[in-house]
């Protein structure tokens, strides 16, 4: 199958940080559209930092549910993400047995 268009791998992180998040299917999740264009697309480091700040403020643990999208496609382009993902998780001690990651 051949796909055309723009993909994350076509951009640098600096370029991606200029974009704002939008609801992908507004016809089904209309309530989410109130947040359109309000937030940057976060990096994993930023999400982990946000979870840590929430814990410090409230004492409530926020778990991470990560999903890599189309990893074989990225591998074919020599952009495998698994090692980088594992290094990032390890940096924040999410490699422990009790880490709230799913």
Regions found by a protein language model. Name each.
Residues 1-102:
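Metal-dependent phosphodiesterase/phospholipase catalytic core, i.e.
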């Amino acid at each position: 199958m051949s796909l055309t268009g723009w993909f994350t791998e076509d951009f640098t992180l600096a370029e991606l940080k200029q974009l704002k998040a939008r609801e992908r299917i507004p016809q089904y999740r209309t309530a989410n559209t109130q947040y359109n264009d309000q937030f940057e697309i976060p990096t994993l480091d930023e999400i982990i930092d946000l979870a840590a700040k929430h814990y410090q403020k409230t004492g409530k643990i926020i778990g991470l549910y990560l999903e890599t999208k189309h990893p074989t496609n990225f591998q074919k382009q020599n952009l495998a993400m698994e090692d980088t993902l594992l290094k990032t998780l390890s940096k924040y001690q999410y490699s422990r047995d009790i880490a709230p990651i799913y």
